[in-house]
Amino acid sequence: MPRKFFVGGNFKMNGNAESTTSIIKNLNSANLDKSVEVVVSPPALYLLQAREVANKEIGVAAQNVFDKPNGAFTGEISVQQLREANIDWTILGHSERRVILKETDEFIARKTKAAIEGGLQVIFCIGETLEEREANKTIDVVTRQLNAAAKELSKEQWAKVVIAYEPVWAIGTGKVATTEQAQEVHSAIRKWLKDAISAEAAENTRIIYGGSVSEKNCKDLAKEADIDGFLVGGASLKPAFVDIVNARL
């Protein structure tokens, strides 16, 4: 069975109530490719609003979640709180949280486990820095990040994961991995899934690409065998996000 193409829009810390509603209403009314799963991820303050405005075909994701169910964790949001708000997805492991907030592979893996066990699906982000790529360590880095998750998750739980490969050097920089570079890493990730998890996980897990995805480069990237969609940053705030969702039309 072919993997369902997946396009996520990560609004990051951008927008306000009005713009969030406008972006989602634009998606609601657009002629979107029906074979694509679309998920938007606004700032936490607008999650409830996004879920109320978005039609049922559009998923809504938190940009983060904590690994404890409740308690004295100022500023954090629990899995149960997100589920009560009818949020089905969360992004975890984004490079901005790895780099700026010093989140470790192990902490991200624990959060991934807590999210899945609590009923969320996870967009699990991995990727290398420019230094790591230039040192030919790309596969080592993404494998290390994946291995941390593999220690926490059962083989069955990978069915709740979408892997997002985002080379750090391409996020928000305008630099984009070539289609060949992206496909090479996606292929290596799929091989890792087969070797470390199962043949079924390798066949069914969606591996999406992020890093300066735009309406200009999405069609070529979408043609690659192991690229199952996109995690879009800045372009998800613009009308061109519709073109990215429709990359395969």
Swiss-Prot record:
MF-aspect GO terms: triose-phosphate isomerase activity
Biological process, per Gene Ontology: cellular response to farnesol; gluconeogenesis; glyceraldehyde-3-phosphate biosynthetic process; glycerol catabolic process; glycolytic process
Keyword flag rRNA processing: no
Domain of life: Eukaryota
Any single GO CC term annotated in Swiss-Prot or TrEMBL for this entry: cytosol
UniProt entry keywords in alphabetical sequence: Gluconeogenesis, Glycolysis, Isomerase
Quaternary structure (record): Homodimer.
PANTHER family, alphabetized: TRIOSEPHOSPHATE ISOMERASE
EC number: 5.3.1.1
Gene3D superfamilies: Aldolase class I (3.20.20.70)
Protein name: Triosephosphate isomerase
Residues bound to substrate: N10, K12
Recorded catalytic activity of this chain's protein: D-glyceraldehyde 3-phosphate = dihydroxyacetone phosphate
Catalytic residues (UniProt): H94 (electrophile), E166 (proton acceptor)
Pfam families: TIM (PF00121)
Naturally occurring in which organism (per UniProt): Emericella nidulans (strain FGSC A4 / ATCC 38163 / CBS 112.46 / NRRL 194 / M139)
Enzyme class of the recorded protein, top EC level: isomerase
Pathway of action: Carbohydrate biosynthesis; gluconeogenesis; Carbohydrate degradation; glycolysis; D-glyceraldehyde 3-phosphate from glycerone phosphate: step 1/1
Family the entry assigns: Belongs to the triosephosphate isomerase family.
Isomerase in keyword set: yes
NCBIfam families in alphabetical order: tim (TIGR00419)
